[in-house]
Each structure stands twice: as C-alpha cells, then as structure tokens.
C-alpha cells in the first residue's frame, strides 16, 4: 500500500523530509492543520510538475468557470448521467458470460467519457469525430502508463521553456499530446460557434457547461464572464480530468463491493426499495441535495456512505505537489521532534520549497477516521466513528479527494452525483464478485489506478451476474 504513504507516516510522523528528483529536499505532509493552511494560503501554488503539465496539455486559459458546476447546474445534468449509466448497463449485459470475468475499466472509462462530453459540451462523443475519440484513448492510456510519470517527474525539475520545446520531440507520447492540443482547440472553437448560432436563432443553450458559460457571456451581466475564446479553451480542462479519475474511483468501489458481498446486498436492497419513486423521495437524490447544501449531514444513507468511503480510501490524486512562492511558516496539529531532538509546532519553509500533500495518508489517519482507517467500512459514516473534530478541509465530507480552498476541484458535485448514479444503476441490476485468478492492486501513476498483479496492465476483472 505504498501508494497511500501510510507506512512512511507511521515510521516518520505526519511531516517528514525526503529527497526528490536530482536530490532536492521536499516535505511529505499529512498533518491536517498543515494541509488546511497550505491549500488555503496564497503563499503556495501548484508544484512545478502540475503547472508544467497543465500548460502543456491544456494551456494557460483552461481554468474552468465555477458557473457551470453550481448546485443547480449539476442537478440539471442528472438525466445525462442516468442515460450514461443505463448505456453502461446495456454494455455490461452484452459482456457478461457465465465462464469469463469482465474487465470493467474500459467500460467505465467509456461511460464517464460519454457523460462528461454530454454534460460539458452538449454533444455526443460521436459528434467529436473518430480521430478525437481515438486520440482521447491514447491520452488516457498515457496517463496510466508506467513510463509517463517517470518522464513527467524528471520534467518537473525543468524550466517551462524546455517543456514547451519537449512537446515537439519525435516521441510517440508527445505526438499524441500535440494532436490532442490541436483537436481540442479546433473542436472547442467549433462547438462555441455552433452554440452561438443557436442562441442567435432564439434556441436554448444553457443545458450544458459550455452553454451556461456562453449564456453568461452573451448576457454581459458580469465582468467575470468568459470570452468566446476562453470558453473554447475549457474543452480540454473539462474532458480529460472529468473521465478517467472518476472511472477509476468507481472501479475501486465495485472491487470493494465484490470483496464485501453482505454490504453489497444491503446497498442493493436500499436501491431496489424505491422503484418508480419520485426524485424527491429517492435516497440517491436526497443524498445529492444534502451534498449540495452542506458538508455536515444530518442523515446519511448507504449509497452516500459508500461514495464517501470509496473517495476516502481511493482519492484520484493521492499525492499533490505545492511550491512555496514566498517564505512562509506552516502550523502543525501537534508538536514534532526534529532530528536534533527539538520540539516544534510549526515549520518554516523558504521560497521555492517543494511540498508533497499526502492526501491518501491523511484520509487514513486513525485519529479522524477510526482505528480501522485502513479498511473499507462504509458504516463508519453512519455509526458515529467519524466526528467533526479537526480542521475543515475539502468541500465534501472533510475529504481532500477534491482538494480544497481556492484550488478546489470545481466539478466535485458532478463527480459525487456521477458516482451515486452509477452505483445505483449497476448495483441494482448486477452482482459483482472477485475473479479467482486475478487480484487487483493499486498503482500510483499520476493518479491511483487499478492494475493486475504484474503491475504493468491497467485492469479490474470481475465476475458479473445479471440479477
């Protein structure tokens, strides 16, 4: 379980020093008070790795506006997610065979890809063309490969101008990235033109993220509205981060359900007890409304508790880089002992210091999540194991799976609803069991991904039975 950094925390504590690329000093941090300070302080920005990757893949203008992911906007995307989940069910039915396991990774990847394209851009993946769909598969595969993180880790220490030069290197990975940048720029502009033409004809366009942003632009009611060019630039920032991380998290959730058939059945009973009910009376929708309204919940149903538990154990971004842009002092929850025996309750850092936020390790702290924090136990969210003590961190259930502060993932409501819809659809129609021959493991490859025991192939084979 090295990907969660829990072993390092148990050996050295919630803050310790380690060597990074080319021998530079870095701090590994899972202390909640320190994490809260770092994610909210203007003295810390994206680390060099993330900053360079964002620039290379997405460009400087690709900062998604929060307008398209407000609580009301996300509610309107629920039919899109339901259709995507139902289409996934149909594909699973076609894939199920009595004597063979099904690898759910590509199926879920395609489903989340379809969902984010429909909700974000207002079109289907087929509308984007075969070339983009094929290139998207290459980009997703690149993010899951073993070699790519090694390239990016070294590249994190290089100046930005070298990164901009590297993209033109005659390497297959960089060729795919060049193609992706061209296609996303072209398609983003094409979709914007189409929506603006529809708006001029009096047609409604505010049914997806792009449409909402363009309606704001056309209305001219706020100085924060994005221009046509800026809306088009959101294409890559919507599509790429909105598919694979959520798909991987859902895969890990299905694997945990397969390991815990008793809980799987309990969840199934809860879902199936509301056939044909109105949205207002469905536990799934009520859980969604609670999520949109507050981080503290008066009641939590089983479907929400599994979403929370999966996000706690399997955050897509298990490790996150930050860099100090000014000299700063980081406060700590408890005093720690230095190598010289001195007790300190804060850590001074210099400008340029690289920090690694150990999100997965924080979300396994026994103090906050219970003595069995390493285990999958959704009931911890129902039985009072988890209390509200400690600093408030992320936007959802005090988890950092979506980060927090000014750099919070703006699509967190969409991701949570997507998980709830997919789990409800799949668990109500299928039974999931582990494949006897394959034991799926975690690997950190820029994000947590499921892999086979050999560690080189992303896959999650399971026995799936139609109920």
Question: Regions from the language model: what does each represent?
Answer:
Residues 180-249, 384:
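Conserved cytochrome P450 catalytic core segment spanning the I/J/K helices
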Residues 19-26, 74-83, 93-118, 127-135, ...:
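Cytochrome P450
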Residues 1-67, 80-91, 111, 180-183, ...:
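N-terminal membrane-proximal hinge/A-helix region immediately C-terminal to the signal-anchor transmembrane segment
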Residues 126, 261-263, 394-395, 408, ...:
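Cytochrome P450 heme-binding "Cys pocket" and the immediately downstream C-terminal segment
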Residues 319, 339, 357-389:
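Conserved cytochrome P450 K-helix/beta-meander segment immediately N-terminal to the heme-binding cysteine loop
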Residues 230, 234-244, 249-251, 344-362, ...:
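C-terminal, well-structured subdomains that either form a transmembrane helix-short loop-helix hairpin
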């Amino acid at each position: 379980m090295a990907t969660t950094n829990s072993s390092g925390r148990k050996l050295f504590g919630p803050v310790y020093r380690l060597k990074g690329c080319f021998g530079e000093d870095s701090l590994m941090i899972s202390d909640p008070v320190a994490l809260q300070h770092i994610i909210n302080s203007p003295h810390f920005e994206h680390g060099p790795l993330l900053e360079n990757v964002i620039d290379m893949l997405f460009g400087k203008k690709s900062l998604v506006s929060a307008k398209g992911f407000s609580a009301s906007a996300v509610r309107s995307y629920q039919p899109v997610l339901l259709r995507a989940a139902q289409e996934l069910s149909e594909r699973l039915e076609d894939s199920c065979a009595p004597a063979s396991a099904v690898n759910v990774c590509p199926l879920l990847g395609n489903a989340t890809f379809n969902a984010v394209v429909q909700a974000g851009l207002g079109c289907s993946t087929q509308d984007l063309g075969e070339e983009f769909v094929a290139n998207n598969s290459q980009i997703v595969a690149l993010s899951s490969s073993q070699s790519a993180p090694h390239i990016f880790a070294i590249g994190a220490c290089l100046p930005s101008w070298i990164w901009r030069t590297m993209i033109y290197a005659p390497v297959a990975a960089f060729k795919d990235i060049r193609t992706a940048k061209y296609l996303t720029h072209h398609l983003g502009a094409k979709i914007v033109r189409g929506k603006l033409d529809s708006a001029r004809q009096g047609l409604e366009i505010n049914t997806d993220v792009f449409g909402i942003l363009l309606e704001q632009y056309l209305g001219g009611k706020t100085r924060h509205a994005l221009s046509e060019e800026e809306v088009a630039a959101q294409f890559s920032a919507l599509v790429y981060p909105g598919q694979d991380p959520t798909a991987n998290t859902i895969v890990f959730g299905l694997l945990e359900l397969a390991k815990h058939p008793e809980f799987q059945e309990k969840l199934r009973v809860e879902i199936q007890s509301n056939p044909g009910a109105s949205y207002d009376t469905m536990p799934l929708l009520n859980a969604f409304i609670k999520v949109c309204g507050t981080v503290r919940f008066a009641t939590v149903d089983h479907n929400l508790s599994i979403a929370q538990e999966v996000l706690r154990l399997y955050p897509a971004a298990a490790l996150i880089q930050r860099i100090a842009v000014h000299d700063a002092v980081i406060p700590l929850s408890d005093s720690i002992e230095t190598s010289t025996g001195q007790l300190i309750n804060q850590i001074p850092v210099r400008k340029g210091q690289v920090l690694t936020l150990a999100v997965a390790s924080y979300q396994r702290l026994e103090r906050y999540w219970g003595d069995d924090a390493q285990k999958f136990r959704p009931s911890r969210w129902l039985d009072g194991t988890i209390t509200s003590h400690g600093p408030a961190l992320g936007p959802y259930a005090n988890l950092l799976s979506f980060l927090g502060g000014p750099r919070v993932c703006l699509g967190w409501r969409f991701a949570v609803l997507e998980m709830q819809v997919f789990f409800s659809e799949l668990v109500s129609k299928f039974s999931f069991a582990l494949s006897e021959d394959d034991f799926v493991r975690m690997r950190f490859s820029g994000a947590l991904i499921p892999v086979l025991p050999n560690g080189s192939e992303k896959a999650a084979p399971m026995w799936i039975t139609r109920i």
